[in-house]
Amino acid sequence: MRLLILFLFLPLFPLAQKKKAPDFALGNFTDDYKITYTINDTLWIQHPNTKYHIIKWNKKKQYLVAKNAESNKEDANKYTRIDYMTFKNMEPYLWGFCLTVYDAATEKIAKKTAYVDRKNPKKGCNGYPFSRMRRVEEKVVK
């Protein structure tokens, strides 16, 4: 009986793991452009009003796929792929991201759209730099 219960719940574990963000990406941040963000395992908020509902984190390939919130003024209910990378010797910026695609019609299209160059973070985001993120004090998410 216990074995049967284990097998019934076993398929749920990989799903839970795919929604887990890397530790460095959790919290409150400001980027190079003074835009603020709050990020957790399931939600990426670009303050004040842009929200991405995270479907999957791919830690190995360093990207996430999200569905744009219905309330977003631009590209509502479309899909976004955000590629990220960590930095060395760029303190206080420890990591950065690229909105690789933000208006894909489907999750599958967003997932397959991959053209970042992490070897060149100054131009590796479709000719633009990765947005560098630095941690800031906590802000209450509403």
Label the predicted regions.
Residues 1-21:
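Bacterial Sec-dependent N-terminal signal peptides
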Residues 7-8, 36, 46, 140:
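A broad, structure-centric signal for solvent-exposed, well-ordered loop/edge residues
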Residues 15-27, 140-142:
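Sec-dependent signal peptide cleavage junction
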Residues 17-19, 59-60, 66:
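Generic cytosolic/nucleocytoplasmic N-terminal low-complexity/intrinsically disordered segments
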Residues 23, 31-33, 76, 127:
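Residues that act as N-cap/strand-start positions at coil-to-secondary-structure junctions
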Residues 26-59:
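Short, solvent-exposed loop/hinge segments that bridge or flank secondary-structure elements
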Residues 30, 64-72:
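Short beta-strand segments that buttress and anchor functional surface loops
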Residues 70-142:
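Beta-strand-rich cores of mature extracytoplasmic or soluble domains
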